[in-house]
């Protein structure tokens, strides 16, 4: 029986050393730099106040000087002063800091248990975003009660929904609705502008002759010149538009010319002049203004003398048909020609 006491002490010390993250315990606490835990065990001195509990009773992290926090305003500094966690993870039911300082004094702090947070039955306060998330954040499962669970057919998965979670997202819903309305208005305005632009282009590209005539739309009459037209009313035919004499003349003037008129317009100015008068042979003999003719020998004869000599030779040959080539008949006019038309150079 006396052997059971040391055996149980040995087993308990072995199990205790296995549970701790640092199991390098030693019974020699007289080594300089070592730290003795509250249970009598010793750890290296460098493990004291390092933010991680190395002793089983966490005595190595107690009464440690709090280092100056370097965390931002929206973060929570752990007790060690080394680690920082998100502010809403404070008192959420989970030890987010390595030393568990984020879950200490949760019920005593009135700011942590304000109306903006969820109050658990056990006194803890958690952020409302952790309600009905499928995890026991309150440690008494009070945050997971009264949640509507729905099972989709064939999926095999349970989806947990909560009205409290939907309450905190109204701005997202309003933003989606507003964006949809603005998008529809922009599309409608763009379609209206495009339709107006296309209609304007179609009106600008109408032929000119169609714009010059009145447009009849059912019983409405649109006239370009209302002050220069005649409108007659008939019971059977309705409104009849009658053009004035000025418009008829304008239409006649604007018609293209015929083929014969076009040819007459293209004739030169001298085409319609009368022909020059015809001169007889005797008148041509009396014309002395013709330029003289110079022969190869150097003697100059006028064109009128040449014509007269040729005419005399023809008459002589007609008077003497029997001797057409005699030198007697031809010498007389040849001798007489130079006497009449010879000019000195």
Curated annotation (Swiss-Prot):
Major place of residence: membrane
Tissue expression: Expressed in the cerebral cortex and hippocampus.
Superkingdom: Eukaryota
Biological process terms in GO annotation: receptor-mediated endocytosis; regulation of protein processing
Short sequence motif Involved in ITCH interaction: positions: 256-259, 275-278
Limits of the LDL-receptor class A domain: 28-65, 70-107, 112-148
Pfam families membership: Ldl_recept_a
Membrane topology, as annotated: Single-pass type I membrane protein
Signal peptide: 1-17
Assigned keywords, A-Z: Cell membrane, Disulfide bond, Glycoprotein, Lipoprotein, Membrane, Receptor, Repeat, Signal, Transmembrane, Transmembrane helix
CDD domains, A to Z: LDLa
Residues bearing glycans: 24
Location of this chain's protein in the cell: Cell membrane
GO cellular component labels: membrane; plasma membrane
Alphabetical list of PANTHER family matching this protein: LOW-DENSITY LIPOPROTEIN RECEPTOR CLASS A DOMAIN-CONTAINING PROTEIN 3, LOW-DENSITY LIPOPROTEIN RECEPTOR-RELATED
Quaternary structure, from the entry: Interacts with APP precursor C-terminus. Interacts directly with ITCH; this interaction promotes ITCH auto-ubiquitination leading to its degradation. Interacts directly with NEDD4; this interaction promotes NEDD4 auto-ubiquitination. Interacts directly with NEDD4L.
Stated name of the protein: Low-density lipoprotein receptor class A domain-containing protein 3
